[in-house]
From Swiss-Prot:
The lineage of its organism: Bacteria, Bacillati, Bacillota, Bacilli, Bacillales. Belongs to the metallophosphoesterase superfamily. Binds 2 divalent metal cations. It comes from the Bacteria. This is Uncharacterized metallophosphoesterase YhaO. Induction: By mitomycin C and UV irradiation which requires RecA; probably a member of the yhaONM operon. GO terms for biological process: DNA repair. Its cofactor is a divalent metal cation. It holds the Pfam family Metallophos. A divalent metal cation 2 binds at residues 61, 96.
Length: 408
């Protein structure tokens, strides 16, 4: 008979993320962003204590680098000690970012922390009231690149009433991510697990709500503008063998993309008010926000005729007013994606051909060269088809903006 279980499933904490490219921000804002990966973990641990969960599953990439810092390790140790005081266990696997082949100063983890250090799946039991209630299976990466299917090796090995597989990897055929530790849905089903606690993909996804439940919780804190929306973990309840789960927010800083339609903006004052209204909505989300602002719609004549650099000045003005806000809405970028009413079809056919060339162009060679760079691979994912499409659209917008001069 299964005793009820409550646990947290999280992954991809990425403690010590460097947040490259934004160190020029005002010091208080950059400090808040840089510490956000740590703060999100604190939020999650607070919830674990509040909810009296039985255990926490951390499915890889707790640290952003294999050469993990002492600061990040000691921080995590302190959080785990808080859990120990409440009788909460922790089960950990390490992934491609924090693989066991790195170099660091080792520390001793509290006795409530159970680390799967093996290169192949192994079992660890969770006991409650003297009975084995759950068997948890997992392994850790020994080096960064693991291209073999390990999911097929998972099998039940005890008579526990509930079985959990922890795996840091990629569903075969998925795009936009390095295909580390690829697996198929059949691999997961054949294992006999009741719940699969996945990690590696930073966008939360429920791959299967049926038995077995297969879930990516996403990362606990976004680190760049490609990771928009709420970030956190799943709170899972097992009652009489039935599994229910709900997403819980943990992020400390929210990253968003916000579109502003400028078609009806009569002047710069009106545009400023539109952006202010957008900021007010974002501010109600309850945490500081980093936002990519996108101007869309038909560009009014006054904006087309504005001096060069006007939008750059506008962005600087918006940033200045947020520099001292504790719950800031910081505009990282201002992208002009507006359309010009001018009819570009009357231009030389050469220009029409340029637009067609952009649509047809294959960027794989260019992007693959970037994706192979070791620094890029440490801190970013592969480009998805959606992102490649966005690159092409941005190129067309820039071309249209330059051609407007020829059509006046």
């Amino acid at each position: 008979m299964l005793t009820d279980l409550t646990f947290i499933h999280a992954a991809d904490l990425h403690l010590d993320s460097p947040f490259y490219g934004i160190s020029h921000l005002p010091e208080p804002i950059f400090a808040r962003i840089k510490e956000s990966t740590f703060a999100s973990v604190r939020h999650m641990i607070d919830a674990a204590v509040r909810e009296h969960v039985d255990f926490i599953l951390l499915a890889g990439d707790l640290f952003d680098e294999a050469n993990r810092s002492l600061k990040a390790q000691l921080f995590l140790k302190k959080q785990f000690e808080r859990l120990r005081e409440c009788g909460i266990s922790v089960y950990v696997i390490f992934g491609n970012h924090d693989h066991l082949g790195g170099e660091w100063t080792p520390i001793e983890w509290p006795e409530n922390v159970h680390i799967f250090s093996s290169a192949v799946p192994e079992e660890k039991s969770f006991f409650k009231e003297g009975r084995r209630i759950a068997s948890i299976y997992g392994f850790s990466y020994q080096a960064r690149a693991l291209m073999e299917n390990q999911a097929a090796r998972y099998r039940r090995s005890t008579d526990a009433p509930f079985h959990i597989g922890m795996l840091h990897g990629t569903l075969s055929g998925s795009e936009g991510h390095d295909p580390y530790c690829p697996f198929t849905h059949d691999d997961l089903v054949k294992s006999g697990m009741d719940y699969w606690a996945l990690g590696h993909i930073h966008k939360r996804q429920v791959l299967s709500a049926e038995h077995p439940a297969v879930i990516y919780p996403g990362n606990t804190q976004a680190r760049h503008i490609k990771e928009t929306g709420d970030k956190g973990y799943y709170l899972v309840h097992v009652t009489n063998g039935d599994i229910s789960y709900e997403f819980q927010r943990a992020h400390d800083v929210l990253w968003e993309k916000a579109a502003v339609d400028v078609t009806e903006a009569k002047n710069m004052t009106a545009l400023f008010q539109m952006v202010e209204d957008t900021f007010s909505k974002l501010r109600k989300k309850g945490s500081p926000v980093c936002v990519r602002l996108v101007l869309q719609g038909t560009a009014p004549e006054w904006l087309l005729e504005a001096p060069k650099g006007t939008l750059d000045e506008f962005l600087e003005a918006l940033q200045e007013q947020e520099a001292e806000e504790e719950r800031f809405v910081w505009p990282l970028r201002l992208d002009d994606e507006t359309e010009n009413e001018a009819n570009l079809t009357n231009l030389d056919p050469f220009f029409g051909g340029l637009f067609e060339d952009i649509d047809r162009s294959d960027l794989s060679d260019v992007l693959e060269g970037l994706e192979r760079h070791p620094v890029y691979r440490r801190h970013a994912d592969r480009f998805s088809q959606e992102e490649v499409k966005e690159i092409k659209e941005q190129a067309q917008i820039i071309l249209k903006r330059q051609l407007k001069v020829l059509d006046t």
